[in-house]
Amino acid sequence: MELATASTMSAAAVTRRINAGGLRVEVTNGNGAAGVYVAAAAAPCSPAAKRVNDGGGKDDVWVAVDEADVSGPSGGDGVRPTLFRTYKVKGSILHPYRFLILVRLIAIVAFFAWRVRHKNRDGAWLWTMSMAGDVWFGFSWALNQLPKLNPIKRVADLAALADRQQHGTSGGGELPGVDVFVTTVDPVDEPILYTVNSILSILAADYPVDRYACYLSDDGGTLVHYEAMVEVAKFAELWVPFCRKHCVEPRAPESYFAMKTQAYRGGVAGELMSDRRRVRREYEEFKVRIDSLFSTIRKRSDAYNRAKDGKDDGENATWMADGTHWPGTWFEPAENHRKGQHAGIVQVLLNHPTSKPRFGVAASVDNPLDFSGVDVRLPMLVYISREKRPGYNHQKKAGAMNALLRVSALLSNAPFIINFDCDHYVNNSQAFRAPMCFMLDRRGGGDDVAFVQFPQRFDDVDPTDRYANHNRVFFDGTTLSLNGLQGPSYLGTGTMFRRAALYGLEPPRWGAAGSQIKAMDNANKFGASSTLVSSMLDGANQERSITPPVAIDGSVARDLAAVTACGYDLGTSWGRDAGWVYDIATEDVATGFRMHQQGWRSVYTSMEPAAFRGTAPINLTERLYQILRWSGGSLEMFFSHSNALLAGRRLHPLQRIAYLNMSTYPIVTVFIFFYNLFPVMWLISEQYYIQQPFGEYLLYLVAIIAMIHVIGMFEVKWSGITVLDWCRNEQFYMIGSTGVYPTAVLYMALKLFTGKGIHFRLTSKQTTASSGDKFADLYTVRWVPLLIPTIVVLAVNVGAVGVAVGKAAAWGLLTEQGRFAVLGMVFNVWILALLYPFALGIMGQRGKRPAVLFVATVMAVAAVAIMYAAFGAPYQAGLSGVAASLGKAASLTGPSG
């Protein structure tokens, strides 16, 4: 176990992909006069004085539902106002939306009944498969739609929170402590430049500096990550005061310097440009040091290894800058120094600051930046790499998060926790304050809120969002609608937690204080560390701030070593009833589910600019692997103790349905996959999937399909997404349904029958394409077996369209066979339209010119049609013989859900 204190850091690789979006700087001259936005009645960087009377709701969609609670600083009745606003969808939109859902549900049931009465006995096997698929489609659609019946929007009122602070007993004393967790594993797949920008944005957040701490979990145990943090701590001494002085947004330097214009909200505009140039120059030098870390450490290690007094013990160690062996993993693996086998490490890089401000110095020759009026304190920063040994299941990210939870309890023990993936950063400096509006508002039921979830927003997704990376339909539609129930599921990043909820304690609404204390005293539940157990009641108290600075003496070191040990979880409740849930790939959803079934609530909220932003995989293969892990984890959740059907009465009925939908959605895609392969029948037989009597069938089908699209347009309206977002979501769902989701079902079946767990690879965020094109990854083809099923479906439907054209040409459009061929072709063309982004993706660089795809498709269809007309059409038999050989049409419908 390694413990140390330092004041510096370092990192490597890849220029961050940035979205330059939205903000403008208007600084006209050096004196900060005209055109400069400066807060007049409030200190720079303070929350806007405007109260959120209209917020996100003054439009033709949303209406406020709590007007009486917002009537000035004291609510008009001597009681504090709520710290957030709640909006509901206007009745003129909500009532028709609900009515259409009901009508479609009735139509689906009527359609099933009609099909049962009109069973096709000539194609019984097709009819049976079709009915099974359609029943599941209808059921799956209902699971997805019912939780959306009561969409609610909640908006944090930062001005009300500022009022509460101002009227508090000790200034900002009412803001409780926050521990911020960042997790990373591989410095190559998760480039270090992403990680260091994430940490820098956290250190510069607009939150009382003595009330939050930042923890980085390096699950790979690499010296590169540690020295990157050493460099970060050093550069933060310049970057953080600069951000505070000029109120810059965003506070991740890579994002900030990539923007061409920024809004200025500070008070010293005359110094902005010179300060900015100086800081940018320092940042470029910082990036050079980060980029060179791999080579720097390797050269240093080689030099030390050559100087071992001629001793050759067969080990080539990785050496730290102080001339000692790195206790984690080495470049050249050795016993106790390889992935999955190394000591635990806790390094305190920045100590907890004092409670009193410490102002910087005036500009001088040695220090050209004037920080004389700026608080230059930095938050606590800690590097952690938990112990790993062979023979132990380290539980991936969930295990790392639980180690962070235990270490932070001993060092800072803040009552609230925010977690980030290493490729996300703080995009809005007020982001830590916003969730406090929900956690601290007891009039709004804040005591029962386990976590606040922000949407995930991404930088540098291609302009057309080919692979639905923004996922706005899910975030701003499905997830937002859960606010009307117990709240959204936990989505893995950009989330603030209540520490008590992570410990598995019950919410105040359901649990008595005595039972909570009894739960804390159960040593078997939380492990052998008595110090950890005794800290839990303090950590669960939201009124407290943060643990005073801890002296790292021998007893604390032993406790830290104990709680990061690889076997600490064994025989305890960690991973099931406490902390993040184990043995499920989607540990985030399962952890949120555990809290909801205990009776906790959650809140989904967003803010402008977005609270957090991150990086999404724009490469087709990496995107498919990402949703493979999500869908596989969902199925693991269904076949585990986290099954929504097993939850108790504290889980809202519609919340139960929402979780059931989250854990079963991949199953329905098995039917979709086979539906998409039914066109093979066009190639090997003369059977069609058209139900008889055809007129009634067509009426039902058109009505059901039309209603789902109208319902979708209502959701587009109230969620604020675009039609393109909705279309991309439909397309990528079909892409997943033809390959990824059925593969996840197959993996789950193998796990159930063999008992072996499923290994899902880490989504790579590295860029392998040329640096001249930030979207080059979009046009890079990485051939993997996961692409094959969708390619087969694509080829089958292109062939089916060709056969349909050939049949229509051979028989004529006015014949029954010709009409059926054209009608069947409509289904095939629809499938091809949904798979269009996939087809572009596998074309690689040629995908930059969609016209090439259209020409190739037309040529392929024409070739199949000509071959069918030449070799497959029975011209020689005459019309009567052809009609006799054709046989009767079989039945099958398209999906009803």
UniProtKB/Swiss-Prot annotation:
InterPro entries: Cellulose_synth (IPR005150), Nucleotide-diphossugar_trans (IPR029044)
Superkingdom of the organism of origin: Eukaryota
Stored Pfam families: Cellulose_synt (PF03552)
Single GO biological process annotation from the record: cell wall organization
Keywords: Cell wall biogenesis/degradation, Glycosyltransferase, Golgi apparatus, Membrane, Transferase, Transmembrane, Transmembrane helix
Active site positions: D219, D588
Membrane-related topology note: Multi-pass membrane protein
Cellular localisation: Golgi apparatus membrane
Binding site for substrate: D421, D423
Enzyme class: transferase
Coiled coil: none
GO CC annotation terms, alphabetical: Golgi membrane; plasma membrane
EC number: 2.4.1.-
Membrane-crossing residue ranges in chain numbering: 93-113, 123-143, 664-684, 694-714, 732-752, 786-806, 822-842, 851-871
GO MF: cellulose synthase (UDP-forming) activity
Keyword Glycosyltransferase: yes
Family named by the database record: Belongs to the glycosyltransferase 2 family. Plant cellulose synthase-like F subfamily.
Role summary: Catalyzes both beta-1,3 and beta-1,4 glycosidic linkage on beta-D-glucan. Essential for (1,3;1,4)-beta-D-glucans synthesis in grasses and cereals (Poaceae). The mixed-linked glucans (which are not present in walls of dicotyledons or most other monocotyledonous plants) are particularly important constituents of the walls of the starchy endosperm and aleurone cells of cereal grains such as oats, wheat, rice and barley. They can account for up to 70% by weight of the wall.
Classification via PANTHER family: X-BOX TRANSCRIPTION FACTOR-RELATED
Name recorded for this polypeptide: Mixed-linked glucan synthase 4
Source organism of the structure: Oryza sativa subsp. japonica (Rice)
